[in-house]
Every structure is written in C-alpha cells, then in structure tokens.
Design a protein with these regions (language model features):
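Flexible, acidic/Gly-rich N-terminal and inter-domain linker regions that tether
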Residues: 1-104
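Short, charged beta->alpha transition segments
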Residues: 93-94, 105-110, 141-151
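Canonical Radical SAM [4Fe-4S] cluster-binding loop centered on the CxxxCxxC motif
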Residues: 99-137
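Core AdoMet radical
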Residues: 122-205, 214-243, 257-260, 285-289
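Non-catalytic positions within long, well-ordered alpha-helices that form the structural scaffold/packing
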Residues: 153, 210-211, 279-280
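A short acidic, amphipathic alpha-helical/loop segment
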Residues: 204-209, 273-277
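Conserved C-terminal portion of the radical SAM core fold
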Residues: 216-218, 240-299, 313-331
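Flexible glycine/acidic-rich beta-alpha junction loops that bind and position SAM and/or redox cofactors
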Residues: 226-234, 263-269, 285-311, 331-349
Length: 354
C-alpha cells in the first residue's frame, strides 16, 4: 500500500491530500508488525510531522506483511521513523472510557459474549473481560468513574454512548437504555444518550427512545454487499432501504441520526449508490471506518482493489462529494479509523483528536 516515506510523499502530492491523512489511512488498513504479543492495542501517536497534535489509535498488530512496524516507543514506515508512541495498552473491554477531554463517556455496559459477531469485529480475538453492569450498579459505577477522574459528578458530560452490540431484541436494548438514562440523572448528567445498534428499528421503539431525552441513534449499517456472509443476523436482515427508513423515522422524532460504515468491504460504485440515499436522513457526520483486517482470514473480505492506497483515496474523495455541501464534518475523537484526521475536502479539521 505504501512502500516508503518517499512513496507516501509522492502519493500525497499527486492526490493533493495532506501526507498525514494518507499515512493514517494506510496504517489503519495495513495494521503493523510488532514485537508486542497482542493482536490489538490502543495508544497515542505523535506524528513526527505534527508532534504537537497527539491523536489516539486502536490498531491491529501481528501483520507480518505490513510496511509499518510499531513497538512501545516508535512507529516506522519501511524502517523509517514517522511517529512516537505513548501510553500503549491492551485493547480489552473496559467498562467505560473518556473521549474529548472527559466530555464524552463511552460505556461497554452489556456483556459482549451475547453477541454473535461480525467478521470484521476484533472481539473474538481478545482475551478481554466480559463486562455487564447490573441496573442497580449503574449509578454507583458512574459515580465512581467520576470520582476516579477527579470530578464531583457528571454535570459536564455532554454525551454518554452505549456502544455494545449485544442486545438480542429491541425491548432489551430499550430497557437497558432507560437504566443508563436513570443512572446519568442520578449523577447530574442531562446530556445526550447515544446508542450504536441495529436493533432499534420500530416506530414504537423510536418513540420510546425519543422519550428518554436527548437521544442519538447511530445505525450500524457497515456494508451493503455480502451482508449475510459478513454481518450477524440482526444487522444482515436490515436492507439498505429499511435502514434509510429507520433513520428517517428517527430524524422526524428529533433524534440525532447517523450510521457506521466500513470502508473497504464494498466496491466504490455500489457503496456510493447506496450511501447517497442516507445523506438526507443523516444529521451528524457518519462513522466511516477504514476496514481493519486482523489476520489473513479477514483479508478475504476486502473488496478487490482496496489493498491499494489509490482505492482508499478514491473512496475518500467520493465520500467527500456526498457530504461536502451538508456542512457535516468528521471528528477524529469520534472515530479512530476515520479516512479523515486533519483535512476534509481541502478544509482543515480542528478540535480534539483523543
């Protein structure tokens, strides 16, 4: 994908993209070789070209064919240092973690072992804990998390995200979301309740979600081709038309809407043909994520051509064409596998990247 730092600079100049974004796309797509004995790690990266702008990544390791190499101190491309590594740790299933300077809280508050899984999901590769917080524990857990983070309560938290994909039915998801909202209120948080899922789909369910207060639904679309082979059943059974309808119904109820999509699973033409129908029902920038193949088995699901950097830059430019006029813009702190970190359609992207 990238052969050297010189190749990186050549590609960036040819496509008129900043080289840092090109590097990050390739890094997420290729993973890295590493002496660290874990399949997946999270860490802060300071690129040598932008040392004062740290960013956060979660990356597949153990890719012997990657041009990137990572250890506890450095990131190298074809043997040449391109960045420094800080705070590396195993990407296990922590119960909760902060983004955006402790204004955004992500919860893994439901047991992940209930999830049958999608082929691109790294959870089955991890010796991770399997957290599940009982309803009576949620308020106490949030209070403890605040105290351990030097906060008296959660009044300053703008969003609490429930990101586990392990709810078998809509009613079970809504029951848990109501418990999370109650626990938020007990700790002074009146912010947005954000849910990533494919099970919240009915009009009755969306009505119930809207009644929970400020609500944000991220529908886990993921891909459009080969859905039965790639996705778990609850996701695969939703057609693209059905997903657009769900987001439209949610938008009508005042719910913030977007979706997740894995870049690298669909051919570009088919992806764009479907995605253009999502634009009118999307109210915040979607989570476009570069496909991370953690092993050779996962490689077989890449769409032909996506093993090249040129394919990814073509896709990025096509996606920019869909969303440039909407005013919606990506933020790296929301999505550490984004095709955009520092620029979008020639515009500088500002704000936190951790």
């Amino acid at each position: 994908m990238l052969e050297s730092v010189g190749h990186l600079q050549q590609v960036a100049a040819q496509w008129r993209f900043n080289p840092e974004d090109v590097l990050l796309i390739a890094l997420n797509a290729c993973g890295a070789r590493s002496p660290l004995a874990k399949p997946r790690m999270r860490f802060r990266l300071r690129l040598d070209s932008r040392p004062d702008e740290p960013l956060f990544l979660i990356l597949a390791l153990g890719r012997a064919d990657s041009p990137f190499e990572l250890d506890e101190n450095e990131l190298r491309l074809a043997g040449e240092k391109v960045g420094e590594i800080e705070g590396i740790e195993d990407d296990d299933a922590v119960l909760g973690y902060w983004r955006r300077g402790r204004r955004m809280l992500t919860l893994n508050s439901n047991a992940r072992s209930q999830c049958t899984g999608c082929v691109f999901c790294p959870n089955t590769l991890e010796d991770a804990s399997d957290p599940k917080i009982r309803a009576l524990d949620l308020a106490g857990y949030l209070g403890t998390l605040a105290a351990n983070s030097g906060m008296t309560d959660l009044t300053g938290v703008e969003t609490v995200t429930v990101c586990t994909g392990c709810f078998l039915r809509e009613d079970l998801a809504l029951e848990h979301l109501a418990e999370v909202r109650s626990a938020m209120g007990a700790n002074g948080c009146t912010g947005t309740l954000h849910f990533l899922s494919s099970v919240l789909t009915t009009e009755e369910g969306l009505d119930a979600a809207a009644r929970l207060g400020p609500f944000h639904l991220t529908l886990t679309a993921e891909c459009f081709t080969g859905r039965p082979q790639i996705l778990k059943e609850s996701k695969a059974k939703l057609s693209p038309e059905a997903m657009v309808a769900v987001l439209g119904e949610a938008k009508e109820r005042g719910i913030t809407t977007d979706f997740t999509y894995i870049v690298g699973l669909d051919p570009i033409e088919e992806a764009i043909e479907h995605l253009k129908r999502f634009v009118p029902v999307t109210t915040t920038f979607p989570r476009f994520q570069t496909y991370q193949a953690h092993n050779a088995f996962m490689d077989i699901y890449r769409t032909p051509g996506s093993e090249t950097i040129e394919w990814h830059l073509t896709m990025r430019r096509s996606l920019e064409g869909l969303f440039e006029d909407t005013g919606l813009r990506p933020a790296w702190w929301q999505n550490y596998r984004s095709p955009w970190c520092f620029t979008f359609a020639g515009e500088d992207l500002t704000g936190e990247r951790v």
